């Protein structure tokens, strides 16, 4: 907290905080030989416990529009394949630490000539998240997703006229268009405007005439805005793995009058 200005009529202060996160697996059970894979998670000595273990996205085949994934041939060379099951069996990669490097908040408070104004923000930097909500909205039109909506990015899907794209073609027979992979790992950095409040306290000289000690009129807005890597992504749902299709806190605007006798 720091006071920028403090006079008889004006008081202006700012504040902020930052928390840094580090973690490392020091030792696993000897039978695990320093590493354990549990579905889409990997635990390895010397590394963060918050890492995912996924098939590696290789883009879109410009000739066919099929989703591609990195795999390995019999000689151990990296090759691209449209068969997700082959990629799953032969080549998966560990992500970097999903946890943010730093998170915290900051804001300001101003009081001047009876008015008071405050702004509160929060932030997160340096982390990653699996955007499962986005992945579900980028399906290829298979029957298992019948009735599901699409993200607007689906307009970028491969067509014979649009071959330079990272969005696979729309085809009801393509089971692997949005399979779990590094394709949907995205930055979890965010800046959120949590609160704005504006108030006015009536002068005491006015209130003394009616026997009231204090009256303050105010208006406040909560959950005002959120800025992230992708519109619609809310990394605040989880900082250890994936988004969970929860509703973002609703934006509210309210006002009131505080009266003290």
Regions found by a protein language model. Name each.
Residues 14-16, 119, 217-219, 257:
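Membrane-embedded beta-strand positions of outer-membrane beta-barrel proteins
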Residues 4, 18-24, 112-114, 123-127, ...:
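Transmembrane beta-strands of outer-membrane beta-barrel pores
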Residues 3-98, 129, 138:
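Conserved small-residue
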Residues 8, 114-119, 205-206:
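Repeated loop/turn-to-beta-strand initiation elements of outer-membrane beta-barrel proteins
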Residues 10, 100-104, 189-194, 249-253:
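Residues that define the transmembrane beta-barrel architecture of outer-membrane proteins
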Residues 39-65, 142, 149, 154-162, ...:
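C-terminal beta-signal and terminal closure region of outer-membrane beta-barrel proteins
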Residues 124-216:
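Extracytoplasmic gating/loop element in the C-terminal half of outer-membrane beta-barrel translocons
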Residues 1, 13-15, 105-107, 195-199, ...:
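Membrane-embedded beta-strand positions in outer-membrane beta-barrel channels/transporters
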């Amino acid at each position: 907290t720091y006071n920028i200005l403090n006079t008889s009529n004006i008081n202006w202060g700012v504040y902020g905080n930052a928390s840094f996160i580090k973690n490392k697996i020091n030792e696993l059970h000897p039978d695990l030989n320093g590493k354990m894979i549990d579905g889409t998670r990997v635990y390895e000595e010397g590394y963060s416990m918050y890492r995912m273990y996924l098939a590696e996205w290789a883009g879109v085949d410009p000739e066919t529009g099929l989703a591609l994934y990195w795999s390995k041939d019999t000689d151990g060379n990296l090759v691209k394949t449209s068969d997700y099951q082959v990629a799953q069996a032969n080549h998966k990669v560990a992500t970097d630490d999903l946890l943010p490097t730093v998170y915290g908040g900051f804001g300001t408070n101003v009081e001047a000539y009876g008015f008071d104004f405050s702004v509160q923000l929060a932030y997160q930097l340096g982390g990653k998240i699996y955007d499962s909500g986005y992945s579900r909205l980028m399906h290829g039109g298979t029957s298992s997703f019948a009735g599901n909506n699409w993200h607007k990015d689906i307009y970028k899907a491969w067509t014979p006229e649009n071959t330079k794209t990272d969005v696979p073609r729309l085809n009801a027979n393509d089971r692997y268009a949005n399979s779990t992979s590094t394709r949907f790992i995205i930055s979890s950095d965010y800046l959120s405007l949590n609160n704005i409040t504006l108030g006015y306290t009536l002068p005491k000289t006015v209130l003394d005439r009616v026997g009231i000690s204090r009256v303050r009129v105010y208006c406040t807005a909560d959950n005002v805005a959120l800025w992230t890597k992708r519109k619609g992504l809310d990394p605040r749902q989880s900082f250890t793995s994936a988004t969970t299709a929860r509703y973002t806190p609703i934006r509210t605007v309210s006002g009131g009058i505080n009266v003290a006798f």
